[in-house]
Amino acid sequence: MFNKKYILYDIIKENEYKIWRSIIMPRIVARGIKKEDLKKVSTELFDTIAKIIDRPRGAFTLDLVESVAILDGEEISRANIEIGWVARPVEVCEKVANAVGEIIKPLGYETVMVSFKSIDLAYEFTFTK
């Protein structure tokens, strides 16, 4: 039988777990948005989300995956923001999604999609030099 608690504490010492978790969450991945647009709003994005979830800005990561959305052979203007973190209540997700939408929508994208991905730290491994 799988015991998540055992695995977590077996991989990461209990006193290091909270520190490690706070360093890497949340992870934001943006697609379908211009690099210059994302750079323009990155500070506001971090500040806004940090305030809502009470996390230090230094715990965030932000990556841009350049992509183009296509519908019926035509490019469409759609920004897709994915936030990966340890699961939070739907009310928190709604609040963050609304705030992110308010920040991205004025940039002129027809559609702004915000989604959340729950990360189970028992299945995550980080390798460094």
Model-derived regions: residue spans:
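Interaction-mediating elements
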Residues: 24-129
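Short, Lys/Arg-enriched N-terminal segments with co-localized hydrophobic residues
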Residues: 3-24
